[in-house]
């Protein structure tokens, strides 16, 4: 079982990391090609392209300018500990034991606009480049054109290496769109999390993102190896709904919103 999640805009390059092991991103050559384009953009270009403040645009222009290889623990950080958004609050990587981190290295992947696909211990440097960014590049008008079937190829290799053909999609639509579903050598299962609001079950973005991280952690800690095992997920008040689920979508409902 292979799990894919989205990255996060917020980063943490300060906290102490509980592991010393690291690996190099598999798609770094592609990243360096993208960086050639990114380095040509001024802060004003980035502000317009990414719809971000001048301050953030300047920060990211500096990040692009300072990007350097080879990656080492001194100039980069393991991906699972570098991202700091709602998904990663749920995942809580810092509290995973060493055996679970090793398991995650084989069974968890992080989609990325700049790095394509990252393993948990792959080193990365700080960046902001969302997958939906319309960044013109030698391959086309946006990042989907750039990555084309590259990410899917690497996912297929990972599926083959870890022994089955089940891919658990815990990524956002923006990021999972970078996966060529027809070319994927596996069955895609998408968990969906709904909270009760005003008497109706709805996807509430903040809660759904955190729940994706909780689900990823659950799979890793419990070494879940089949879809039936996913149905036992009951963390943070979520309960599997057979009625609302299908063969490719597993729906979890929660009656009371958590803090």
Curated annotation (Swiss-Prot):
<dbReference type="InterPro" id="IPR005583">
    <property type="entry name" value="YaaA"/>
</dbReference>
<comment type="similarity">
    <text>Belongs to the UPF0246 family.</text>
</comment>
<dbReference type="GO" id="GO:0033194">
    <property type="term" value="P:response to hydroperoxide"/>
</dbReference>
<dbReference type="Pfam" id="PF03883">
    <property type="entry name" value="H2O2_YaaD"/>
</dbReference>
<dbReference type="GO" id="GO:0005829">
    <property type="term" value="C:cytosol"/>
</dbReference>
<protein>
    <recommendedName>
        <fullName>UPF0246 protein MADE_1015435</fullName>
    </recommendedName>
</protein>
């Amino acid at each position: 079982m292979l799990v894919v999640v989205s990255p996060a805009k917020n980063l943490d390059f300060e906290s102490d990391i509980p592991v010393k092991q690291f690996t190099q991103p598999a798609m770094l050559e592609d990243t360096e090609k993208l960086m050639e384009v990114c380095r040509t953009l001024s802060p004003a270009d980035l502000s317009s392209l990414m719809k971000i403040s001048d301050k953030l645009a300047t920060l990211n222009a500096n990040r692009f300018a300072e990007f350097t290889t080879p990656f080492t623990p001194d100039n980069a950080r393991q991906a699972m500990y570098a991202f700091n958004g709602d998904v990663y609050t749920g995942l809580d990587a810092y509290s995973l034991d060493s055996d679970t981190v090793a398991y995650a290295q084989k069974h968890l992947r992080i989609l990325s606009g700049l790095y394509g696909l990252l393993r948990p211990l792959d080193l990365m440097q700080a960046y902001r480049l969302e997958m939906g960014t319309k960044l013109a590049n030698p391959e086309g008008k946006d990042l989907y054109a750039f990555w084309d079937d590259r990410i899917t190829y690497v996912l297929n290799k990972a599926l083959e290496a870890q022994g089955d053909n089940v891919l658990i999609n815990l990524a956002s639509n923006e990021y999972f769109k970078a996966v060529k579903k027809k070319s994927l050598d596996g069955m895609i299962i998408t968990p969906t999390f709904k909270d009760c609001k005003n008497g109706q079950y709805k996807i509430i973005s903040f809660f759904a993102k955190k729940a994706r991280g909780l689900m990823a952690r659950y799979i890793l800690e419990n070494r879940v190896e089949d879809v039936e095992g996913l149905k036992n997920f009951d963390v943070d008040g979520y309960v599997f709904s057979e009625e609302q689920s299908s063969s490719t979508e597993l729906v979890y409902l929660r009656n009371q919103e958590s803090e």
